[in-house]
Amino acid sequence: TTYLNIHELRKEMGSPNLDLCTEEIEEIPYLVSLSDRKIPITFFRIPNKEKQSAIVFIHGGGYIGGSTLVLQNQCRFLAEQSGATVISIDYRLAPEAPFPAAFDDCKDVVKWLVHHADHWNIDPNNLSIAGESAGGTLAVSCGLSEVGKYLKLVIPIYGALDVCSASDLDYWDYDLYDVIPEHKKYVITRLNRFRNLNGT
């Protein structure tokens, strides 16, 4: 039996990326203290005195990896381009913290932000949530939960939202999608990883 080395897998997540910001962006790490645990978050914002809208951004990583560090430049750029305060959540990861730990962390951070909005100079009536991959799924889950009433907008970026069984995925055909010819083999190899996870 081959076992997955979770620590090695986590080290491989993310890829080098550029900081595209042209303005100064503040990064403020903070530890949200709840009655039973602490959740690390990071605020990204243009440093000014104005009350800002807020975007909670949830990283991807298949619920087993990823972190704010992987998407640091993306969060900085989102803050610069939107003028909003971006809050990245370092939710608990599986397998050390199985479901619903990540979901609970994200929901609890949204609640905490609403109750501490004045302290962080954010507008609790203009709070959105976004995420990519597993983070997109967590964002939608938050939007459908009891904290959804606080959210003005939910933005899933390629979240796992299809409820079809793996046997229903045979319609997939790579030829239906335009790919730069020299990148095709690489793209197919990457996409096949997801199909192989489902045994299809």
Regions found by a protein language model. Give the residues of each.
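Short, basic/low-complexity N-terminal boundary segments at the transition from targeting/disordered tails
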Residues: 2-14
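Alpha/beta-hydrolase superfamily serine-hydrolase fold, recognizing
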Residues: 4-5, 19-200
